[in-house]
Amino acid sequence: MTEHKETIFIVDQVTPKPGQAKAFLDTYMARYAPAARERGMTLVHQWVSPPMWLDDQSNTLTIIWTVKGAPAWWAMSHQGRRNPEVAGFWDSIKPMIVSRHRSFSSEVADLESLADV
């Protein structure tokens, strides 16, 4: 069995409405994070910019998860798409959000082995 050591980073960047960043993050951690962990994702960072909770403006939250190797990424992605609770979470929290974006990244040194699936 091949051991997959490459780290794939799942980066959620969310801009909640003014004054809503802390409430959004609390809800994300309570409702989204447990299911993400069940799908094999490991939480590595929760960043807030600027580094204070704003009341009259929007913060930007960057939440970074990881999985090990392409098979874990595909499994996580497949499970998330088939779970109506994931879509339901994002639909329910939409009123708190100005924008959100998810991206996936890896180390350049891992690209060749990640592409060898």
Question: Each predicted region: which residue ranges?
Answer:
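Basic/polar N-terminal segments that are highly enriched at the extreme N-terminus
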Residues: 1-5, 116-117
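An amphipathic, aromatic/His-enriched active-site/gating alpha helix that lines ligand/cofactor pockets
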Residues: 2-4, 26-45, 56-57, 66-105
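Active-site-flanking beta-strand signature of metal-NTP-handling nucleotidyl enzymes
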Residues: 8-14, 62
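Short amphipathic
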Residues: 11-13, 103-107
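Short, surface-exposed ligand-recognition loops at beta-strand->loop->(often short) alpha-helix junctions
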Residues: 16-24
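Short, solvent-exposed loop/turn elements at beta->coil junctions and helix N-caps
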Residues: 47-53
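Acidic/histidine-enriched, glycine/proline-rich intrinsically disordered or flexible terminal extensions
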Residues: 105-117
